[in-house]
From Swiss-Prot:
Keywords: Cell projection, Cytoplasm, Developmental protein, DNA-binding, Nucleus, Synapse, Transcription, Transcription regulation
Basic motif: annotated segments: 237-271
Protein's recorded name: CCAAT/enhancer-binding protein homolog 1
Region (Leucine-zipper): 275-308
GO terms under cellular component: axon; cytoplasm; nucleus; RNA polymerase II transcription regulator complex; synapse
Gene (name only): cebp-1
Acidic residues composition bias: residue spans: 182-198
InterPro entries linked: bZIP_sf, C/EBP
Residue ranges of domain bZIP in the record: 233-308
Length: 319
């Protein structure tokens, strides 16, 4: 990495002593010594020679392009040189060159002041973060740098809110025009006497008009009345009797199936009630057994173990 530059006019530019830089200077790709003042931009004040990091970065990129002209974008770049150059600038904060070109650009862009509200910092934090050129917010008017982009809130006047409205049921298409001309013209949305959930019932006149104008969409089954002579024939009477018997038989069978289903349903209900009773009796028996056991355990005193002393046992054994 590159060593710090000497900003004193009394001493000359010291040679870069780092081994890595020596190797770079001996090779075809040299360091920044081929640039005037080691790549640093000089100002009219001449107090010190400040190294321009943008120029150094551009020169490094140009060197990389010369080494790898084909796959420059695909080549991995070592950012250590760029970062070290920025780290080695070491420009004293109390000796700023206000005539520098980069600083002049910043002054032109920001009009000499910061366009934002500066934070409240103590003396040490101001010196570390901004240097001696930091301005206290109380020294100037901060409101003069605020952007005037406030928009007045305009609330449209909708007038009185409509809480009620008339709702009509759909009517047949045939008498739609007639009903609309007679009844709907009297109803308006501004009518406050009608509730939202209220539906006006149709009048008898509307129902009668609907029945008169009704047109069936399906065709009826063709049926012709028999003549009196044909009804008097015995074959017709026999046919009608057989038909009536078949209808009665079908109805009787359907009724029997319905009765059977109802009987099975009642039987299942009784069975369910019986099982529920057995289950409840089982639960009651278990609860009674548990209560009995708990009562016995509470009434039973602690068992005292009567142990004979060891000496007494030996005496009995010797006898």
């Amino acid at each position: 990495m590159y060593s710090k530059l000497n900003y004193s006019h009394q001493k000359g530019d010291q040679a870069l002593k780092h081994p890595h830089l020596v190797r770079l200077q001996q090779s075809e790709v040299r360091g920044f010594t081929d640039m005037p003042n080691n790549g640093a931009s000089t100002s009219s004040a001449g107090s010190f020679a400040r190294q321009d990091s943008l120029t150094i970065a551009a020169s490094l990129q140009q060197r990389d392009r010369e080494r790898h002209p084909v796959d420059f974008m695909e080549t991995e770049l070592d950012l250590g040189d760029y970062l070290q150059v920025l780290h080695d600038l070491d420009v004293p904060t109390d000796n700023v060159d206000f005539d520098d070109a980069e600083l002049q650009k910043c002054n032109i862009l920001y009009d000499g002041e910061h366009p934002y509200e500066q934070p409240e910092l103590n003396g040490y934090e101001r010196h570390v973060a901004y240097g001696t050129g930091y301005r206290v917010p109380g020294d100037y008017d901060q409101d003069g740098y605020k952007m005037n982009c406030e928009v007045k809130a305009e609330t449209p006047d909708f007038g009185a809110t409509k809480t009620r409205r008339a709702v009509k049921r759909p009517v047949p298409y045939d008498d739609y025009q007639k009903e609309y001309s007679e009844e709907s013209s009297d109803m308006t949305d501004n009518d406050g006497s009608v509730d939202d959930s209220y539906f006006e019932p149709k009048s008898k006149k509307t129902k009668s008009a609907g029945l008169e104008n009704f047109k069936p969409q399906t065709r009826a089954r063709k049926y012709k009345l028999k003549a009196d002579e044909e009804k008097a024939e015995p074959t017709y009477k026999l046919k009608r009797a057989r038909n009536n018997d078949a209808v009665r038989k079908s109805r009787k069978k359907a009724k029997e199936l319905q009765d059977k289903k109802e009987a099975e349903h009642d039987k299942m209900k009784r069975r369910i009630a019986e099982l529920e009773g057995l289950l409840q009796s089982e639960r009651d028996a278990r609860r009674r057994d548990q209560d009995t056991l708990e009562q016995l355990l509470r009434n039973k005193g602690p068992m005292k173990e009567q142990r004979m002393p060891q000496r007494h046992i030996l005496e009995n054994f010797n006898k």
